[in-house]
Design a protein with these regions (language model features):
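N-proximal short alpha-helices
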Residues: 3, 25, 97-101
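Short, compositionally biased low-complexity segments
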Residues: 1-5, 28, 62
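A short, conserved beta-to-alpha structural element at the edge of catalytic cores
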Residues: 168-175
């Protein structure tokens, strides 16, 4: 029994490491596109934060939801987004997740439970809380994860939604 558990852990660790490498590879390629002026708009890299997205998304199911930040590429990849559609989105192509209209800071893949990135600092917190409220009302066994950065801690919305989530016992994790 112990041997199989070790194998399972080794497989999980390898899967998570591979996912972290995939995110870094995506970010390196996206950065090159940006620096070569082939990508319209701005981009904010997620390099160095890969373990956060992978560790959290590894525990989620496809029906669980996430919301993201302006540095959302890693969250998207960790939740199962395809590179081709992500790069198409970054390049403004119709084949992108948002038909090329969202760009780097607004990628969403609802088929994988990714409700989208948000360029507004702390802007996805209300969306995540609303998604968790919806899950609770519908009796779904889903959780919503709201990724946010340190800048969001200066936004009043953060404290308002955390208070609401605690009072209403919503299935949301602020990470």
């Amino acid at each position: 029994m112990t041997v199989s558990k070790k194998n399972t852990n080794s497989e999980a660790y390898l899967r998570m490491f591979t996912q972290m490498v995939r995110i870094r590879t995506f970010e390196d390629n996206a950065n090159q596109l940006y620096l070569s002026a082939k990508m319209p708009g701005l981009t904010h890299m997620y390099s160095g934060e890969e373990a956060v997205a992978v560790g959290i998304c590894e525990a989620l199911r496809i029906t669980d939801k996430i919301t993201s930040t302006h540095r959302g590429h890693g969250h998207c990849v960790a939740k199962g987004a395809e590179f081709k559609q992500m790069f198409c989105e970054l390049l403004g192509k119709e084949e992108g997740y948002c038909r090329g209209k969202g760009g780097s800071m607004h990628i969403a893949d609802q088929s994988n439970g990714n409700l989208g990135a948000n360029a507004i600092v702390g802007g996805s917190m209300g969306i995540a809380t609303g998604a968790a409220f919806s899950s609770k009302l519908l009796g779904a066994d889903d959780v919503t994860v709201c990724f946010f950065g340190d800048g969001a801690t200066a936004q009043g919305l953060m404290y308002e939604v955390m208070n609401m989530a605690a009072l209403w016992k919503l299935p949301v994790i602020y990470a």
